[in-house]
Amino acid sequence: MTVTTVMSAAAFMGPVASAQTLPQIPEEELNAYPVYSGKDLELTVDAEGTHFALWSPGAEAVRLHLYADGHNGDAYETVEMAKDAATGVWRASKSEKLYGKFYTFQVKIGGEWLKETPGVWAKAVGVNGQRAAIVDFSLTNPEGWGSDTYVVTPHQTDAIVYEMHHRDFSAHRNSGIVNKGKFVAMLEPCTESDNGELTGIAHLKELGVTHVHILPSYDYNTVDETQLVDRQYNWGYDPLNYNVPEGSYSTNPADPYCRIREMKEMVQALHKAGIGVVMDVVYNHTALGDDSNFSLTAPGYYYRHRPDGSYSDASGCGNETASDRGQMSDYIVNSVKYWAKEYHIDGFRFDLMAIHDVETMNRVSAEVRAINPYAVIYGEGWTAGDSPLPVERRALKENVSKMQGVAVFSDDIRDAVKGHYSREDDRGFVSGKAGQEETVKIGVVASTSHPQVDYSKGSNSKFAYATSPEMIMNYVSCHDDLCLTDKLRKSMPEANDSVRMRVARLAQTIVFTSQGTPFMFTGEEIFRDKKGVHNSYCSPDSINAIDWNLKKQNREQFDYYRNLIAMRKAHPAFRMTSAADIARNIVFDKVKEDCVVSYSIKNHANGDEWQEVKVVFNGNDREVTVNVAKGNWTIVAADGKIDKDGLGKSKGGKTVVASRSALILAR
């Protein structure tokens, strides 16, 4: 979510019953709870039987309810659990392996029994996630899972990230995909649109991206998994069970094994295609407050509060979690490690990451990279409101230099290039708005210090907050706010789509030639729109689904994106890994024209075969002339076309740059 695209708690109307009143526990008492770091929460099965362990230090009693069904019927047995006062963990065991059964916990606190909960560590659930399931995970692995491996990008700047939603990508009637909106849509290898263009996973391979960033795939609250015939839609930023795949993306949500196996099959299929999987994680808030699994196990502990006892709300969604408390910090770290190990997830995108503390994010980075050294980790370096967490401890973009191996989205390049994210008619550099040149330069150098960049003239940040380009994710649009097509239609009403597509190419050329890691939103390579809807989090498929027939209609646009990606992958000059290299190798030209940025990348930067690259961006609606050093140049991009192997030759000197386009020369 961006700071303007937030959903009220009232929007989260899932299948959970109405809230109950929880006891108010003093902050000092919550802070004194023991932190338990054992690996046996909340379910283990071994040769001796099935063991249950719930961390609930403030509970007066805890019951374990056992069920034969994941959704219907009463408990066939209730067990009183025993407390270990030193750890705050309540335990119970059964002498048999209870595979195929379901369970919930129920906590008594303040003299009252709270509602039942599957706990916070459920790894398998019944339909709608109200009861945890006991499964044999060895039976969830697809054939060949043991040899499945992470996708290797030696540096984060080598990644090219493509953001997508399961339904958006496959739901349209012309996708050619049978399992629309499902994990297993990615298992269909050679799907085609009505007019014969590749779709699905074949499209991703043709485009050339290295990673897909998939919107929330854990079990979320707003889709009723018993009513999927209704074609419900949600982005999923309303977490219910953090460690279980979302059932609506499986072919049988009532089968606890199905969603687990099918998500693994999706990851495996993408890995076989050479594409890594980045999981969008939303540990900053929960869909429910008093009725969340956190609240029903340890009321008050997992959240931050205002002095009056109400939830603080830096998420804009009704609550915010307290990563600065030991058990919550451990939870976040162990949860992402679980996804990395069990599901072979290649990376993580943290929603509203600045709600979390720097220390927790550093733990995430270190411990995930101990599993996969090539993990891609990034997040939104902002909040949607104020937080009790001190500013200096927040994982803000301004604090990114305090974090190791964690990147933040650059709202600097986003707003400078296309126009302000929330002012829909505001223009940016690519649509002819003067005064954005210095902020574009900030984007080019990945917000690192550079002797020719004046941060005081930046539109957003006023200092070089990144100490490495690997700390920056460059983008112009994502699932939030208007997609790029709709933004250009709103801000350039006088233009036609042919002109807007040209402007979109320039925008993405700035992103893909800038230092840092490029990130793009699904479908923009074929100029998809969302019919002007700026917050489509619960809009139907008619708004969100990719119309794959656009690929043939806008084939020139797709080919430009594909060739742009190929150029970046072939040339490490665009993927430097240190601020010192950027400062040494990038030289900006003095330009008098508005909406023009011109620079050179010199010295075989980052081991590139090109000794020098000349890059010029022209956001004007007219051509401009720039001076290029005389010599033998290959024209790589010009007048809305691009080819890493060359479009032609140039001798330099006075050179024309066509309107709303990029010029790239190499020698």
Task: For each feature predicted by the language model, list its residue ranges.
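Substrate-binding/active-site clefts of carbohydrate-active enzymes
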Residues: R167-Y343, M361-N372, V376
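The feature marks proteins involved in alpha-glucan
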Residues: T21-G49, D84-E188
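Conserved alpha/beta catalytic core and glycan-binding cleft of carbohydrate-active enzymes
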Residues: A132-V135, S365-A366, I371-F527, Y537, ...
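Conserved, mostly hydrophobic/aromatic
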Residues: L54, F105, M164, I214, ...
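Sec-dependent signal peptide cleavage junction
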Residues: V6-T21
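Carbohydrate-binding surface patches
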Residues: T44-A53, P57-E60, V587-V628
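C-terminal beta-strand-rich structural cap/linker in extracellular carbohydrate-active enzymes
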Residues: S56, G100-Y103, L647-R667
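Catalytic cores of secreted or luminal carbohydrate-active enzymes
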Residues: K552-S578
